[in-house]
Amino acid sequence: SVCSYCDFSNNNPPADMAKWEKIQINATTMDKFCCNNNIMPDFIKMDIEGAEMPALEGGMKTIQECRPQLAISIYHSNEDFINIPLYLNKNLKNYHFKLGHYSPWRSETVLYAIPQEIKF
């Protein structure tokens, strides 16, 4: 993966993104990270600027085994608004789904997935 870093200390505006230094970083999936570190999440929140679907795909085994509550942003693309709920509904058994919308515009729509064993 490639990660960009921006130094705003010299009042560089975001338009200077072409000048950002590019560095290589190691990345992993949620499944590998949780397994390697013996982590059993009970709540997962994702607002990762359109990377929610690949993150969910890389964490589905953990989500299925640990059954955490989820709060997943789905507003970054029209496809996410449709595909993320369909993907979760297909892959998660006995979950309730709810939408939360926190803006008068298209942004800030969150899909909540709550295991049925959790009463709300």
What does each model-found stretch correspond to?
Residues 1-120:
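Phosphate/nucleotide-binding beta-alpha loop and adjacent structural elements of enzyme active sites
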